[in-house]
Amino acid sequence: MADSGNWEGRCTGWFNVEAIVERKTGDPIPEDENYDGGDTDESEMGDFIDNAHIPNIYAQQEIAQALYQSQQANADNEAIRVLKRKFTGSPGGSPDMKRDEFIDKQLSPQINVLSISSGRSTSKRRLFEEQDSGYGNTEVETYETEVPGLGAGVGCLQNVNEEGNQIVSPRESSSGSSSISNMDIETESTPITDITNLLQRNNAKAALLAKFKEVYGLSYMELVRPYKSDKTHCQDWVCAVFGVIPSLAESLKSLLTQYCMYIHLQCLTCTWGIIVLVLVRFKCNKNRLTVQKLLSSLLNVTQERMLIEPPRLRSTPCALYWYRTSLSNISEIVGDTPEWIKRQTLVQHSLDDSQFDLSQMIQWAFDNDITDDCEIAYKYALLGNVDSNAAAFLKSNAQAKYVKDCGTMCRHYKAAERKQMSMAQWIQHRCDLTNDGGNWKDIVLFLRYQNVEFMPFLITLKQFLKGIPKQNCIVLYGPPDTGKSHFGMSLIKFIQGVVISYVNSTSHFWLSPLADAKMALLDDATPGCWTYIDKYLRNALDGNPICLDRKHKNLLQVKCPPLLITSNTNPKADDTWKYLHSRIKVFTFLNPFPFDSNGNPLYQLTNENWKAFFTKTWSKLDLTEDDDKENDGDTVQTFKCVSGRNPRTV
């Protein structure tokens, strides 16, 4: 290829090889064909075609085409990148995208690559179309645009990217900024389907209420008291169910019988089908969700077609409606009528709704031995459904005043009752209020376990209960965990005595509970407490009258009740309190309190056991004032603060 002649010869041969397509390599060449490239052929063909610049032209065209394709590819990639950034954050894509397509694209972004369809599909027309507001937020139908390839004329689809977002083809993006601005649609706006469902759900209850009023002639809300929470419990419910199948509506009464104590069923027909109105009282309290699930399973009706609220219990018109409709032939009744309907419709129940009587409330508190104000208020309010006076109490606007007055009067009556009884009568009264079945041996065995002789203890207890001077105080002394406090507390609980604490000794009123007590306990007396007793309470230990200071009241002179003291200090072993030695009787508890293998006390010091103990030792304790009770009756008159009433006549 150094000389021009040889190069031109090969070029001519190249054209001959292209023309001879069917000759194979290795075939023999005929002799009549000359491929030597002589001077004669070169001179004959040299002036026919000027091909000196052909290789350079082809090279330039190939370079330009490759450069153009590279530029177009970069432009396409840039346009795709810009659109991806623009629509990032809207994984749902267009609002018209179907749910299945959205799920598929979320699970596999490359699912569109495997599609065998033509891809030319438009979104279907929706049932509720959004009106065009003119602000460019209208939903538009998207078409797949075919973008022809610039190299070999092959088209490709470029309208949806991997994330399901609509993008613009390179041809449209190169036409100017106006085409891109037309595609600037806010994809994160609320879908029209969600808004429609929301409107339908909000308007559903209004539509049901309107249809109910049209069919039954009165408003549903006039019969019920709405509950805001679906989890609030109630026993009575008013249920309206729309579009019930006739066969299920007829069998509803028998289906509900196993769940309810009372059923009032009405069925009317309208354009929507059968509307069932039922007043039910369940056997136990239920909330709205439970009632919805029950009716949905029995009637095969969705919860959106139900109205469920509790009835108005204090509305006379509502009670009259249920009473009047129960007498007609459109209603089916099962069970006894609820008391709130009877109370407002029947004559006798109306007469029972009298005014509140405080004396009945006081009598109830006295008979049940309830003196705490909060306990009186709570337990008496629970009787509102069975007691007419309690119902009147609940209707009153002065409940707090009534509770305070009731508690005050009940405490006064109880204090007067205790003061009227002797110690023997009071112990007998406490025994009457205690159950039988106790074992007196547990108390005796515990005293024997602590090495306390039973007969001296019994003699001291007899003098202690009588309040004999110098015998009015018993001290239980011993190391910790020997059962002193347990023994003393069990006795005070049975006698229903009071407990005083030295921690309140800085107050002038810390001894005021002794004014109304039959027996008192001072637990865990320390050396400082013994010093205080030696200085100020010698007369109290003697059993003589003392003067007590009460808050907001005058000083009260009373005889100190029998006083039981527990202590880890033996006052008789210290001469500092030598003036107390003759005023107290000390019993020593030295052994730890015994427990069984389960951790329970080995000796049960209960009210039943104390009742059995006093019954067994009644004569030895000289509690013989009421020996003739069986013949003469009870000497204590039964308390009654309610005046007699004549039966009311109509």
Curated annotation (Swiss-Prot):
Gene this protein is translated from: E1
Residues with Phosphoserine modification: 90, 94, 108, 121
EC number: 5.6.2.4
GO terms for biological process, alphabetical: DNA replication
Location(s), subcellular: Host nucleus
Region (DNA-binding region): 187-353
Pfam families noted in UniProt: PPV_E1_C, PPV_E1_DBD, PPV_E1_N
Motif placement: Nuclear export signal: 107-116
Ranges where the SF3 helicase domain occurs: 452-602
Protein name: Replication protein E1
Binding site for ATP: 478-485
Transmembrane segments: none
Domain of life according to the entry: Viruses
Keyword Phosphoprotein belongs to the record: yes
EC top class named in words: isomerase
Catalytic activity: Couples ATP hydrolysis with the unwinding of duplex DNA by translocating in the 3'-5' direction; ATP + H2O = ADP + phosphate + H(+)
Gene Ontology terms for molecular function: ATP binding; ATP hydrolysis activity; DNA binding; DNA helicase activity
Glycyl lysine isopeptide (Lys-Gly) (interchain with G-Cter in SUMO) cross-link, chain position(s): 559
InterPro entries (UniProt xref): Helicase_SF3_DNA-vir, P-loop_NTPase, PPV_DNA_helicase_E1_C, PPV_DNA_helicase_E1_N, PPV_E1_DBD, PPV_E1_DBD_sf, Rep_E1_papillomaV, Znf_lg_T-Ag_D1_dom_sf
Motif (Nuclear localization signal): 84-86
Species name: Human papillomavirus 73
Keywords: ATP-binding, DNA replication, DNA-binding, Early protein, Helicase, Host nucleus, Hydrolase, Isomerase, Isopeptide bond, Nucleotide-binding, Phosphoprotein, Ubl conjugation
PTM comment text: Phosphorylated. Sumoylated.
